[in-house]
Amino acid sequence: MVIGASGKTGRRCVSYAASKGLPVVACTRSGAFSARDAGVADASAAALVASERCDVSKASAAELATLLDGAGSCIFAASASPSGGSPWEVDKAGLVAVARACLVAKVPRLVIVSSGSVSKPLSSIYAFLNLFGGIMRAKIEGEDAVRALYFDREGCDYVVVRPGGLTEDEPRGVAAIELNQGDDKSGRIARADVAAICVEAAERAGTPVAADATFECYWADTGKSLGEVGLSNALGGTTDEKAYASGRERRGNTWDELFEGLDADAPGVSQQGWGPSL
């Protein structure tokens, strides 16, 4: 199930899942969804796509639990928009409501699309993006609420995906992607590659792979420290031999290789950093 399927990343999640032969429910505020408009050209793949209405800023707990009943996994790709609620209504309260419903419905895995630098209020990226309705603070508070909710919950886990600067480029695939943990490094990445990461993580529900993990994702050849990445992304910069290395980078030629070795979050522990933007 993909919540926020009408968004740029959400619809790519639906398309990628269907292209893999996975049945997927596309949840939008209106309930309308066109698989063809989302890039699902193959008729047999399009037949795997169903649609449901879900406005996370307005849906009741009972409605969300009913919607999620029987889901094998849930991708939360919803975010604030002029027509769809504020960051506090969607990125925080909406996420928390969906997480609670996932636990009630015993959905094995919740995959959350968040943002790189979200735990670093002193970074220039956080400070800039947070100007838009406090979206970065809403996102990190939503993340941390999920960590608290999932503390010591058997049979259900979460994955937090923190993309770098999102592009509309064609996907480069798993071998081009780098993951990092610690929120001290970022870069650029196509929305289509983020969608692939989310679906691949969701497909591994019920396994230890990436369970309760938070990680950043970006193309390896664009990786920079948070202090450098804003300007680098704006200029289309690439990595050089002097580029910052955290020591926590992950690469792989397959999805299992890419996800291998990711550390789970400290159970229930907040990752919200300190800074003037708070």
Which residues does each predicted region cover?
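Cofactor-binding loop segments of dinucleotide-utilizing enzymes, especially the Rossmann-like FAD-
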Residues: 5, 29, 115
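NAD(P)H-binding glycine-rich loop region in Rossmannoid oxidoreductase-like domains
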Residues: 26, 31-105
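Active-site-lining helix/loop region of Rossmann-like oxidoreductase modules
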Residues: 3-5, 164-278
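N-terminal Rossmann NAD(P)H-binding glycine-rich loop of SDR-like oxidoreductase domains
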Residues: 1-22
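Glycine-/Pro-rich loop/turn segments that contact NAD(P) or position catalytic residues
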Residues: 80-186
